[in-house]
C-alpha cells in the first residue's frame, strides 16, 4: 500500500480550461518536477506534514495519507459536483498512489479530471483507465523560462487521446508565432480535433499577458493548424474564488 502527500483538498469552481465554471472537488498534490518562473501554486512545490480540507468546515489532516483515507476526506465535501480535479504541483509524480486512489473514487461514482504538465507519460499510463478528462498543460519556454519538453508531451498526449482531452498553453507577451506553430503541430500529430486553449498568464512576478489584439493573432496562428482554438483566461482570480 502506497501513501500520498497532499497540499490541500477543497470545494470550488473550475476556473480555467474547457470545463470553466463547473463545480468540482479539488485534490492538490504536493511536489512538481518543473520550476516555472510564473508558477501560481508555489505552495504545492514541496511535501508538507499536513493538508487543509476546506468545505463547509475547515480542518486539517496529516500527511502521508492512504488512498482510503483520502477518499474518506473527499466524502466530507458534500457539495454537488461535476467531477474531482486531480491537480498539483504535478499529480503524476504520485502515480502509484493515484493507481490506488482513483479506482476507489470511480467506485464511488466520481468523474475524474486530471490536470498535468504533460511530461510524465509512463505515469499517466498507470492510471489512464480511471481518468475521464485530461487537461494537458504544454509548457512554452517563453512562459516558463525552461526548454519545452515536446517529446514527453507527444508521448503523453497519445496516451491521453483515448479520453476527453484538451491542451492548454499559458501565453505571455513574449510568446512567439514559432512557439505556437511548434506546439500546434505537436498536437496535430496526435489529432487535429484536440482543442487547444490559449490562457493569458496571470500577472504575477513580472509576468505580462499578451494584449487583446495579439491574443486574436495567436488564436488565428493556431487555427491554421488545429480545428478548435479557444482563448480562455482564468476566472477564479477575477471572481475571488479559490
Each model region followed by its residue ranges:
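N-terminal [4Fe-4S]-dependent radical SAM core
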Residues: 1-66, 76-78, 241-242
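Short, surface-exposed acidic-centric catalytic microdomains
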Residues: 40-46, 50, 70, 127-129, ...
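Short secondary-structure boundary/capping elements
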Residues: 62-69, 148, 152
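Conserved AdoMet/S-adenosylmethionine-binding subsite of the radical SAM
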Residues: 80-83, 92-230, 234-242
Amino acid at each position: 500500500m502506497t501513501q500520498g502527500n497532499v497540499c490541500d483538498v477543497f470545494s470550488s469552481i473550475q476556473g480555467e480550461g474547457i470545463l470553466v465554471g463547473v463545480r468540482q472537488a479539488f485534490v492538490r498534490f504536493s511536489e512538481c518536477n518543473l520550476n516555472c518562473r510564473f508558477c501560481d501554486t508555489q505552495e504545492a512545490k514541496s511535501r508538507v506534514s499536513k493538508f487543509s480540507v476546506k468545505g463547509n468546515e475547515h480542518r486539517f489532516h496529516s500527511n502521508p495519507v492512504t488512498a482510503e483515507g483520502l477518499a474518506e476526506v473527499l466524502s466530507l465535501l458534500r457539495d454537488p459536483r461535476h467531477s474531482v480535479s486531480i491537480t498539483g504541483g504535478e499529480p503524476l509524480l504520485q502515480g502509484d498512489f493515484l493507481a490506488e486512489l482513483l479506482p476507489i473514487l470511480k467506485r464511488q461514482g466520481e468523474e475524474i479530471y486530471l490536470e498535468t504538465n504533460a511530461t510524465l507519460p509512463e505515469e499517466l499510463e498507470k492510471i489512464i483507465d480511471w481518468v475521464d478528462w485530461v487537461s494537458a498543460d504544454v509548457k512554452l519556454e517563453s512562459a516558463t523560462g525552461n526548454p519545452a519538453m515536446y517529446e514527453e508531451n507527444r508521448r503523453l498526449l497519445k496516451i491521453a487521446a483515448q479520453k476527453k482531452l484538451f491542451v492548454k498553453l499559458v501565453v505571455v507577451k513574449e510568446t512567439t508565432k514559432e512557439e505556437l506553430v511548434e506546439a500546434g503541430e505537436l498536437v496535430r500529430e496526435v489529432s487535429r480535433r484536440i482543442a487547444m486553449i490559449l490562457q493569458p498568464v496571470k500577472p504575477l512576478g513580472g509576468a505580462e499577458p499578451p494584449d487583446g489584439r495579439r491574443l486574436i493573432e495567436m488564436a488565428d496562428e493556431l487555427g491554421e493548424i488545429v480545428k478548435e482554438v479557444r482563448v480562455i483566461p482564468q476566472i477564479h482570480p477575477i471572481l475571488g474564488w479559490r
